[in-house]
Amino acid sequence: MKQKDIPGRRSMNNKINRVMSFLILGLAFAAMIFETGNAVYTWSKQADKEQRYTIVIDPGHGGNDPGKIGINDVPEKDVNLAISLKLKDILEQNDCKVIMTRETDQGLYQDGDTNKKIADLHARCRIINDSGADAVISIHQNSFTSESSKGAQVFYQTTSEKGKVLAEILQEQLVSGLDPENNRVAKANSDYYMLKNTQAPMVIVECGFLSNTQEAELLTQEAYQRRVAWTVALGTLQYVSGGHN
């Protein structure tokens, strides 16, 4: 006998699919933490065809703007891009539409621009505001005069409630996935240009301190970059699939 379509069943099935996908990703991430090799991690998921989330990934700096220079002389822009590309791969495998502000070592400015930094920031904001994104993740690395400072931290626009939720979810994942002893919390900021001039829920993820010898070394290792990308992906998917966007 053909079963009647009960109202709400399709919606419930979609929610179940999203939860199952999130659980599968979590299990894959847990297995990845204990893996020391460079294997490529894959998982199966049942895509929700009625809902495809759009995520903008913004690798900070690039081109003639190196960002911070690590204690090991590694420029921040290279670490940002490496983590961002890994994050892109993971989110795309989870059926997200990913828009990158840059995919090479190139700034978003023209050679003739008088102020290339301002031109770059304007271009990034245009990409984000035209994207209709459910979430925006800007990847950066921190630095401080004291070499002892360490730990990932997420920043959000002070007046953005959705940005705050996204930041708190990501901060929790970064602490549990990278360093349980990290006591930093998600922090509001009212000064960052891109946070003030974008419409979608946006956060700036400072993945670690390039001024700290230990973290600077880790952040240049592909396996650790992948681990950072997984934690950020896990938090991002938790945010969008939870209906916060």
Regions found by a protein language model. Give the residues of each.
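Catalytic-site microenvironment of enzymes
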Residues: 1-245
